[in-house]
């Protein structure tokens, strides 16, 4: 295996390191550093999959590592926001519930392309960044309402997909 084949997983691993760094810098009011860490994490999130596909080194392990690093980063960022009083603690339960729903409906054998999961993850990353760039209460309320709408859409989409799949299997 060439050294280049490790690049995507190294980029993904950066998010595991970024999570506690963000937590520390945010809670210590080092917002510029926190934003820089978030931007770096978002860049690695975009690049890891792109580079893996370009180098033809995609793997199930890489896909799971990517989803897990996203989840860790998102939960840690929102935990910091909850500690600061920016969001209600229930947001963490919502995020964890949606992740568990994703895992339960995606299957544990092989990662699948899940557009709603991608949209939700992308929105959560955007929500983290917008929350720190525009920390006004009304902005966070709007972001939270949109998150609830996305989560409801995701749950309904999964419900109808599973129901339709069962109907097709019974034919």
Regions from the language model: what does each represent?
Residues 2, 67-171:
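A feature for the membrane-embedded catalytic helix bundles of lipid/isoprenoid biosynthetic enzymes
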Residues 4-5, 13-17, 131:
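Hydrophobic alpha-helical transmembrane segments of integral membrane proteins
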Residues 10-61, 77-80, 96-101, 140-153:
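Membrane-embedded alpha-helical segments that form the functional core of polytopic membrane enzymes
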């Amino acid at each position: 295996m060439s050294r280049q084949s490790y690049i995507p997983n190294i980029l993904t691993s950066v998010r595991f390191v970024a999570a506690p760094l963000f937590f520390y810098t945010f809670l210590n009011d080092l917002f510029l550093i926190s934003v820089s860490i978030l931007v770096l994490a978002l860049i690695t999130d975009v690049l890891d999959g792109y580079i893996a596909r370009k180098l033809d080194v995609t793997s199930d392990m890489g896909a799971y590592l990517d989803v897990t690093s996203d989840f860790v980063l998102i939960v840690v960022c929102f935990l910091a926001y909850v500690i600061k009083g920016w969001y209600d603690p229930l947001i963490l339960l919502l995020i964890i519930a949606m992740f568990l729903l994703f895992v339960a409906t995606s299957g544990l054998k092989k990662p699948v392309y899940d557009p709603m999961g991608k949209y939700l993850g992308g929105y959560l990353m955007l929500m983290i960044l917008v929350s720190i760039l525009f920390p006004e209460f009304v902005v966070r309320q709007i972001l939270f309402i949109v998150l609830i709408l996305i989560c409801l859409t995701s749950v309904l989409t999964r419900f109808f997909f599973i129901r339709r799949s069962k109907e097709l299997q019974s034919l």
